[in-house]
């Protein structure tokens, strides 16, 4: 069985390959990436919610590839910012900004707040879609706090700022294996993998 991991983020695809099962029952699963489909064009994330974006990406990728596709949308929700950056997490500092610019904007937005006022969560919505347009959704959440600066060398995006609830480390200070055991993405994709037939 072949399933397309519909993400252009190579680090995310690597993470997903570590999380997802290699077999379902007696079926071996081969996970393909967008690199295996050079003509496939992913849609713009025009949804107003994480759910809408995950569905949009998975359904379109499955339709174009002709095989089942897994996609997700992840957002960082910060309580002191009324849930921002949320669905716009990748574009928080602007449409064409890089992760460092997003991180700096987040730190600036929280300037003056104590650590206890910086509660946040990562939320991932995963979608499994068929070429016919049918889909299933699953959600995963990881709670924590936004620190005062960058810590750690691993991960990507907001990982160097996000202190995991119950730990003294940021996601970027964890090894990939440690992160994959607790992450919001793991929780969502473990749930969605139970729906693969």
Curated annotation (Swiss-Prot):
Cofactor: Mg(2+)
EC number: 3.6.1.66
Binding residue positions for Mg(2+): 44, 73
Biological process annotations from GO: nucleotide metabolic process; purine nucleoside triphosphate catabolic process
Disulfide bonds: none
Active-site residue numbers: 73 (proton acceptor)
Protein name (record): dITP/XTP pyrophosphatase
Keyword set, alphabetical order: Hydrolase, Magnesium, Metal-binding, Nucleotide metabolism, Nucleotide-binding
HAMAP family documented for this protein: Non_canon_purine_NTPase
Subunit structure: Homodimer.
Source species: Elusimicrobium minutum (strain Pei191)
Coiled-coil zones: none
GO cellular component, one term: cytosol
List of residues binding substrate: 7-12, 74, 156-159, 179, 184-185
Enzyme class name: hydrolase
GO molecular function, one term: XTP diphosphatase activity
Function comment: Pyrophosphatase that catalyzes the hydrolysis of nucleoside triphosphates to their monophosphate derivatives, with a high preference for the non-canonical purine nucleotides XTP (xanthosine triphosphate), dITP (deoxyinosine triphosphate) and ITP. Seems to function as a house-cleaning enzyme that removes non-canonical purine nucleotides from the nucleotide pool, thus preventing their incorporation into DNA/RNA and avoiding chromosomal lesions.
Family from the record: Belongs to the HAM1 NTPase family.
């Amino acid at each position: 069985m072949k399933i397309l991991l519909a993400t252009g983020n190579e680090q995310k695809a690597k993470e997903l390959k570590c999380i997802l099962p290699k077999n379902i029952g007696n079926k071996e699963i081969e996970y393909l990436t967008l690199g295996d489909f050079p003509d496939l064009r992913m849609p713009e994330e025009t949804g107003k919610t994480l759910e809408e974006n995950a569905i949009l990406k998975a359904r379109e990728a499955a339709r174009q590839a002709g095989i089942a596709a897994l996609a997700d949308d992840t957002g960082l929700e910060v309580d002191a910012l009324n849930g921002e950056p949320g669905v716009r997490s990748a574009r928080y500092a602007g449409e064409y900004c890089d992760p460092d610019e997003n991180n700096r904007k987040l730190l600036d937005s929280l300037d003056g707040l104590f650590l206890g006022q910086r509660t946040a969560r990562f939320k991932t919505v995963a979608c499994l879609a068929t070429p016919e347009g049918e889909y299933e959704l699953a959600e995963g959440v990881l709670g924590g706090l936004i620190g005062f600066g960058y810590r750690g060398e691993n991960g990507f995006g907001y990982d160097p700022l996000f202190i995991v609830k119950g730990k003294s480390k940021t996601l970027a200070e964890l090894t990939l294996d440690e992160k994959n055991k607790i992450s919001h993405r793991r929780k969502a994709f473990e749930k969605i993998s139970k729906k693969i037939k």
